[in-house]
Amino acid sequence: MKGQETRGFQSEVKQLLHLMIHSLYSNKEIFLRELISNASDAADKLRFRALSQPDLYEGDGELRVRLSCDKEKRTLTFSDNGIGMRREEVIDNLGTIAKSGTKAFLESMGSDQLKDSQLIGQFGVGFYSAFIVADKVTVRTRAAGAKPDGGVFWESAGEGDYTIADITKPERGTEITLHLREGEDDFLDDWRLKSVIGKYSDHIVLPVEIETRSKSEEEGSDEEVVTWEKINKAQALWTRNKADISDDEYKEFYKHLSHDFSEPLSWSHNRVEGKQEYTSLLYIPAKAPWDMWNREHKHGLKLYVQRVFIMDDAEQFMPNYLRFVKGLIDSNDLPLNVSREILQDSRVTQNLKGALTKRALSMLEKLAKDDAQQYQSFWQEFGLVLKEGAGEDPTNGEAVAKLLRFASTHGDSPAQTVSLEEYVGRMVEGQEKIYYITADSYAAAKSSPHLELLRKKGIEVLLFSDRIDEWMMSYLTEFDGKAFQSVSKADPSLDKLADEEDEEQKEVEKALEPFVERVKTYLGERVKEVRLTHRLTDTPAVVTTDADDMTTQMAKLFAAAGQAAPEIKYIFELNPDHALVKRTANLGDDGAFGDWVELLLDQALLAERGTLDDPNQFIRRMNQLLNA
């Protein structure tokens, strides 16, 4: 062998191999599914490349993957005639995990979490699953279009390093030989192999063939005759009639498609004929991928044109807020030589995207209606992503809004379980708007003084504490004809909720007019306005913003993104019935008066923002007033 060298695995590969071998052992037969799935992908890629370069078939266009056993050597070999790999591709594909953030993710996980097979499965372990049952793996491969002496040899015991070399390989494709560990001989049994392949890979388009040996029927001959028996249907699952496909087949196809170990929550298989002809098979996963928030996270549908594989991760067919949807689309209206650039500008693509988006949203609506518990499980995994749809997809705004879930004052749990339809159904007589509050946490939202009057009136308030919520509400302006209203903003509808003023209240307010003017004079330009309010019951003062001003939470979003935000000028609202306000109003000494006004304002700012510009000064002032 020429060019032989020993190279070390990328550190993440070593860690993942160790974890995978131990965490996936109880489900060890999945290595068959993963390796056959890889062979299927290799065949798909060759078919696509051969559309423009038919010579890549090298006279062998019958694509398949073959399994053969050697019981004496205790080896199991997978051999395909797909696209194959060059030396650089072998190093990239078998020596590294080309996923940004993998190392940081592995380091952030506790040992117990990393024993979770579903978590490990999120990495798309693929080829590495061979080491669950093998103590050594040998790969021989040659890329389509390369010369016979352009083959590559790769071998590893799945520990710290691997050997790579140049070899001569007459046939195109990849051959993977597993040297089985002690106790894994059942995978040398034909019946066992057929059973597992039938379970996991019946839906694979690529024919899966198993080697069978029998004695020659010619008289006097001792020769063995080798034949290849096809053991799967080898028909694209999505082209079959829905009535002929079992739930288990749909679930296994999802695992093949997504390399996810969990079963999907739901799926939708549809064939559309007419103005556009296409077949789609969409899945809603049960678990979010570990790198869903990574900018380089690949998402999108697998694209076929007239049953010919074109590309993975075609993100042009699904909006970004539905990036968790898995599946495929097989179109009859796109050209076979379609590129990502053509897809981006294609009217066909835009029409398909619109139809598939509505399909995915209807799947979620059906899940929410038929199984609230399952939908709640979905929301915990993907709710934050779905909230992006309020701003990204105004066309389907109402459909997205119906799928949103929030915490509210209706219950005592931070769980986001309340739909907008449920909220509207519970609105009290005379209530015109949907009230909400945004805060840094559920606890801060629930205990906000802005809720006092609404609680007294029995009016439900939605409690928002996710970072995205404030951004979302800049787009989500109404639902079912009802406008949304932040309770931390000044609004006439909130003032209307206060009890009708009696003569006594009017007299109190008139008597406090000089006090309000005195506070205004003292604070000057630090606040936008000072006024009395009847929206409070237990709190002496709050700060609010005008309807058109930036909110506190939005300013925090700007700051977190490193962007400058305009300074917020708050409206300082005082509760005329509170003892501390009355006490402050009766102070004649300007120094004491100033201290009490500062204390009331700082309390209001602390409740609104969660922080103060000078907390030490606030503490000193409070201690001083307590000792007075």
UniProtKB/Swiss-Prot annotation:
Residues 557-628 are annotated as: C. Gene3D superfamilies: 3.30.230.80, 3.40.50.11260, Heat shock protein 90, C-terminal domain, Histidine kinase-like ATPase, C-terminal domain. Residues 1-340 are annotated as: A. One of its GO terms (molecular function) is ATP hydrolysis activity. Residues 341-556 are annotated as: B. One of its GO terms (cellular component) is cytoplasm. Pfam families: HATPase_c_3 (PF13589), HSP90 (PF00183). The keyword Calcium does not apply. Disulfide bonds: none annotated. This is Chaperone protein HtpG. The lineage of its organism: Bacteria, Pseudomonadati, Pseudomonadota, Gammaproteobacteria, Enterobacterales. HAMAP family: HSP90. The gene is htpG. It is found in: Cytoplasm. Homodimer. Keywords: ATP-binding, Chaperone, Cytoplasm, Nucleotide-binding, Stress response. Its main location: cytoplasm. The keyword Flavoprotein does not apply. Belongs to the heat shock protein 90 family. Molecular chaperone. Has ATPase activity. It comes from Sodalis glossinidius (strain morsitans).
